[in-house]
Amino acid sequence: MNLIQTLEAEQIAKLQEQKSIPDFRAGDTLKVGVRVVEGERIRIQFYEGVCIARSNKAIGSSFTVRKISFGEGVERVFPLYSPNVDSIEVVRRGVVRRAKLYYLRGRRGKAARIAERRDVRPSK
């Protein structure tokens, strides 16, 4: 490992001690708590939707969450190790055969549903 990779690995280890990041992948429904600063107040705003993509690039890892808000599709990209991401909770796990679910952008209503994954063996 070169010097940059070593430094990034140390930073990731330090950030993982502070907050727990669950094991999730594309197709899972997530509830992401985001820190919002309003003047002097800080509050947590939750954003719930389907994870349609995950990019694992060390400290630059991110994931995309899509939800339907008032009949309009809204996508938001969250940096995984950002201090503004307060919490990540897996609401339900989905069965998909793709790593990127961009095809959901063209689907509406029941066509955009994802079946729930029922694991026979317990998750690690």
UniProtKB/Swiss-Prot annotation:
Entry-linked InterPro entries: Ribosomal_bL19, Ribosomal_bL19_CS, Ribosomal_bL19_sf, Translation_prot_SH3-like_sf
Similarity annotation: Belongs to the bacterial ribosomal protein bL19 family.
Pfam families: Ribosomal_L19
Transmembrane stretches, start-end: none
NCBIfam families in the record: rplS_bact
Job description of the protein: This protein is located at the 30S-50S ribosomal subunit interface and may play a role in the structure and function of the aminoacyl-tRNA binding site.
One biological process term in Gene Ontology: translation
Keywords, sorted A to Z: Ribonucleoprotein, Ribosomal protein
A GO CC annotation given for this chain: cytosolic large ribosomal subunit
Record protein name field: Large ribosomal subunit protein bL19
Name of the encoding gene: rplS
SUPFAM superfamilies in UniProt: Translation proteins SH3-like domain (SSF50104)
PROSITE patterns, A to Z: RIBOSOMAL_L19
GO molecular function per UniProt: structural constituent of ribosome
